[in-house]
């Protein structure tokens, strides 16, 4: 049986992500080793914290190239929260360049009267890619859990898989292109609907591993 590499770079709540994957039948393996990531049937890049230290930690472990190579080979990939932002070229939060998998930038919410930043709590999703495997069997506008001050702003709006609105600002809540999927929210903290999203990812992994 293959395994899902959950990348450890000192920036993620790995326990809750692994617990969620295990609950839905996945076989997660926490690792910071390039050869382990290279042998995985899928990769999950979680993350909580700031952009620059995250990129620095990935590069210090020599993980940038193995992640890019795995993605180029078509390995199913799921980024979560900060892990989703690292796929982009850069962030307004820092000076480091990102992985550059998805062209675009990570931006900070604009201040507006009555708007709480960070965006923290439950919010509904609007599906831009309703047929994406992650959304299979979900209700319309499912409520998921967010904690973030920055958001993904891809150059190509076609890669936006779901959107959400905070104040007057509608932003990308998820992106998907080929084998790469990434969510700004925390599926592992989003109750039964979040577990369903993880289950859909695990199902895709199983199908791709046949």
Swiss-Prot record:
Residues 3-210 form the Glutamine amidotransferase type-1 domain. IGPS catalyzes the conversion of PRFAR and glutamine to IGP, AICAR and glutamate. The HisH subunit catalyzes the hydrolysis of glutamine to glutamate and ammonia as part of the synthesis of IGP and AICAR. The resulting ammonia molecule is channeled to the active site of HisF. This is Imidazole glycerol phosphate synthase subunit HisH. Pathway: Amino-acid biosynthesis; L-histidine biosynthesis; L-histidine from 5-phospho-alpha-D-ribose 1-diphosphate: step 5/9. The gene is hisH. Heterodimer of HisH and HisF. Disulfide bonds: none annotated. Its main location: cytoplasm. Signal peptide: none annotated. It comes from the Bacteria. It comes from Synechocystis sp. (strain ATCC 27184 / PCC 6803 / Kazusa). It catalyses: 5-[(5-phospho-1-deoxy-D-ribulos-1-ylimino)methylamino]-1-(5-phospho-beta-D-ribosyl)imidazole-4-carboxamide + L-glutamine = D-erythro-1-(imidazol-4-yl)glycerol 3-phosphate + 5-amino-1-(5-phospho-beta-D-ribosyl)imidazole-4-carboxamide + L-glutamate + H(+); L-glutamine + H2O = L-glutamate + NH4(+). The keyword Cytoplasm applies. It is found in: Cytoplasm. InterPro entries: Class_I_gatase-like, GATASE, Imidazole-glycPsynth_HisH. GO terms for molecular function: glutaminase activity; imidazoleglycerol-phosphate synthase activity; lyase activity.
């Amino acid at each position: 049986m293959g395994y899902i590499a959950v990348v450890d770079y000192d920036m993620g709540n790995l326990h809750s992500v692994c617990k969620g994957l295990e609950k839905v039948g996945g076989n997660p393996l926490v690792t910071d080793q390039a050869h382990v990531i290279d042998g995985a049937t899928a990769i999950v890049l979680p993350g909580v914290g700031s952009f620059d230290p995250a990129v620095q930690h990935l590069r210090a472990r020599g993980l940038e190239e193995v992640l890019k190579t795995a993605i180029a080979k078509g390995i199913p990939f799921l980024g979560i929260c900060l892990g989703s932002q690292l796929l982009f070229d850069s962030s307004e939060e820092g000076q480091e360049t990102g992985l550059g998998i998805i062209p675009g930038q990570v931006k900070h919410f604009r201040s507006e009267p009555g708007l709480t930043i960070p965006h923290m709590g439950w919010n509904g999703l609007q599906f831009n890619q309703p047929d994406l495997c992650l959304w299979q069997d979900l209700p319309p506008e499912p409520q998921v859990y967010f904690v973030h001050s920055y958001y993904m702003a891809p150059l190509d709006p076609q890669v936006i898989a779901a959107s959400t609105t905070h104040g007057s600002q509608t932003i990308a809540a998820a992106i998907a292109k080929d084998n790469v999927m990434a969510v700004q929210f925390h599926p592992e903290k989003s109750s039964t609907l979040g577990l369903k999203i993880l289950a859909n990812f695990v199902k895709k992994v199983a199908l791709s591993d046949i």
